[in-house]
Structures are given as structure tokens and as C-alpha cells.
Amino acid sequence: VFGCAKKENSTSSSNEETTISDDSSSGSMILSGKLAQGYVRGAKVLADVDGDGIRDSNESQGTSDTSGSYVLNADPGSWMLITSGGTFLDSKGNEVNALPMKAPAPTTSGATSNVTPLTSLVAANPSLKAKLDALGGDGWNADIASSSGVPGKLLRIAQTVEQTMMTLSTGSNAVLTTDSSKLKTLDKLADAFAMQENISSNEALAAATQEGVLNALNDENVVTLSADQKKIKGALVDATLVAVDSVTAAISDTSENVVETSVASTLEAALDNATSVVGTALNL
């Protein structure tokens, strides 16, 4: 599980394990921000130095509060923020398991470092930073769950990533079942988005999703598919495109702000539809 302690061998003391798994942080930089799909509460936030996604004793870790906020101290470096666990509330007030996300290390102390689907793309492919910044608002570091909203261009990209990932990782027919497979799929999506020009357009969102998902499903280092899942790769891609269509229908390609909660119920219904496509294909 990402952000949690590495398993110690049987000779390790329980005190050593507790020390590594408990939240603690130190360093000359103060960083804080929001974990946003909805606002993600109770998630571990790890300043991952060695890139393995598993907390070591020298790595700072915190937990997001009920408003999705976190605070950490860490030393400057090339580490990455990685989240694991946590939940957010859907439009009906039900808790939904959050996706793992990541974000680049900030370069200055005190800077706001949000962790969202957008920052996850940039952490995986830094060339996307300029493309997302060009879309307005706070660009790649936008708080996508803000009650003030964010430019529709940014929100539709964030929601395309989120709905695609949720389609493949929700319910009893989930294809992506580990944080590792989810984060590696995010990497594939980021590389596919980086190849698009007008990345918030309907065409770019569909093309990037199709390519990124196919590349993930075809890479055994990302996910090992069952025999039945291998037979329905096309249907799995189609299901994610159903989710993307719902995003582009609900969120205009606009520079005007759109509030995430205003489209949440529509996207939740569409996600149910997309995951049912996966279930139907597997049961044929």
C-alpha cells in the first residue's frame, strides 16, 4: 500500500515498525495544500525520496484532514508527493475511496502544493506543466474542488483522468486493484496527454484516454490481466471513453470557472454506466 510502512522482517521490533508507519515530518521546507478529487480526507501524504512509493524512516509523511488539507516538513530535493488511501464525499454524502495521486516537489518553502489528477499528470510528465498553465486559473496546481471553481478547460482534463481511472478501478470487476497499477496507469495517461496539442478539446481527451489506457493494459509492468480481461481490452477502452463522453458533455471547454460539485451527480451516474459496460463485457 502506498504511503505506508515497508514490511519489516520477523526479527524487527514492533517499535521500529510503529516508528516508520506513524506520521512524522522534518526538514527546512514547509509544504501544504489540498488533496482534491472531491476533498480527500484521511489519506497518507508521503514525500517519497527514492520513488518506490513506500515510506522509509527518512521520509516525511502526514495525513489529510476532513477538509482535504495537509501540512508537511521536508528538505529540498527531487522527491515526489504521493498519496494513498482516504475518502471523499459524493454528491449524496457517501464516502468514496480516493485514487492515489502524486505531485512534484515544490521548489520554495511555504508554497501551496495541491495534489490532484492534474498534478499527477505533471509529476509523470513535466512537459504538461506549461500546457496546463496556459489554460488559465492556477493552471496545473489548481485546487479542482474549490467552491469558487476552476476554468472548465482544466476541470474537464482533471475529470477525464479521474473518471477514466475510476472506471477501471471501481467495483467487483475492477481491473486496476493496486496503488502501483493505478499510478503507473496515470503515467501512461500523462504521456498520452503530452502528445496532444489542444489538450482540453473533446478530440484530445478521447485520443489521450484511448492511447493511455491501451498502453497501460498492454504493459504487464502496469497490470497483469486475467485471461477474461485480456479478451475484452477493447470493451475496457470503450468503457473509459463512455466516461470521457460524459465529462465533455457535462463540462464545457471554457475559460470560465466551473464548480466541481455542480457536475458531480451527473458524472457519478455516468460512472455507474461506464462500470456496467465493464461488467457486461466480462459476463458475456
Q: PLM ranges: what are they?
A:
Residues 4-284:
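Feature for extracytoplasmic/surface-facing segments of secreted or surface-associated proteins
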